[in-house]
Amino acid sequence: MSTITVLGAGAMGSAICTPLADAGWDVRLWGTWLDDHLLDAIERGENHPRTNQPFAQGVTLYRSSELDEALEGADTVIVSVASVGVEQVVKMALPGIVKADALMVTSKGFLEFDNGDVLLLPDSIRRIAADEGYDNLPPIIAVGGPVKANECAAREPTATIFGCKDLDVAIKYARAIRTDNYAIEATDDETGVEICAPMKNVFAIALGIADGLQEKTGVPHHNLKAATFNEAVREMSILGTSQGADEMTAFGIPGVGDLEVTGLSGRNKFYGVRIGRGEGPKEALEEMARLEQTVEGVPAAGLALKFVEQHAPELHDQLPLMNAVIDVLSGQVEDVKTRIGQAVLPARP
């Protein structure tokens, strides 16, 4: 039995333990210093507070002070913390990570370094490792696709995708982790998977705004939402292509699939609903933070702009929806519907 250590006991970190255990892995779950109350609930036999689902049987739990023990002898490591915590956790875990056969990443977002550079998470991890003096980082597998943590934990049918520059590694792990309810595609388009992962969070805010406008006015805004969805996929595709990704990745489960599920019920969508109903972006974010609901699309939006400015400045004017969401998040847009509409409705021929 191979050993896999999941770093991060939040919704996704705990949820992925279910298919891992079902697939026959020896699973370890390490919680950060922010996860103590989550591990407490699991140890009491309660449902996980974030997924409201029973926790997988047979998984060994480790507290934040037990990182070395959690990583000892691990064949594979999964980073599953919020994007803002990736740098710190990776630095702490590097001595164990470099001994593993592969590093999987379910975290979604960009990372900004002290010098202002903004990179996708796999490239960020490679830089962190190099800066810390490690040149033996194992292959990185980007985990993407439409996976709601609560449904994954409940063994509901779920499609995901493993993206690794070494396709053989992606296929190997897809075969080793797949279960009857957790189906996995394999691709060598790591970049495409990682572009879609944070960008769909940004665009899901706009989808939520359309739903919020409907709640506020009582008038359906399905047309606006559909146009927003279409524009979001287009922008994910052209941004990915500019970085060497397959243009079709955005039209598969990393893009269309993940955007669909996030736009239906994700935290980023619900944040957008609040804005569409009339709440200020700052106030809505504070309320969701009070409820322990992380809205990763907010920091991702600002970092996406910096990423574009650094890596694809020629695309700035070709990403109107990204720019519109950033404007809305600034709190300076009075007519949110008009601003989103300007970004997604076709221009006059």
Map each language-model feature to its residues.
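NAD(P)+-binding Rossmann beta1-loop-alpha1 motif at the extreme N-terminus of oxidoreductases
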Residues: 1-54, 59-62, 92, 97, ...
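Nucleotide donor/acceptor-binding cores
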Residues: 2-3, 101, 158
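Short beta-strand/turn micro-motifs composed of small residues
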Residues: 8, 31, 107, 144, ...
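Electropositive phosphate-/nucleotide-binding environments in soluble metabolic enzymes
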Residues: 10, 14, 36, 61-64, ...
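Rossmann-like NAD(P)(H) cofactor-binding subdomain of soluble oxidoreductases
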Residues: 60, 67-72, 76-155, 173-175
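Internal alpha-helical scaffold of NAD(P)-dependent oxidoreductase catalytic cores
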Residues: 96, 130-139, 157-249
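NAD(P)-dependent Rossmann-like dehydrogenase/reductase catalytic/cofactor-binding core
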Residues: 200, 205-211, 226-234, 241-349
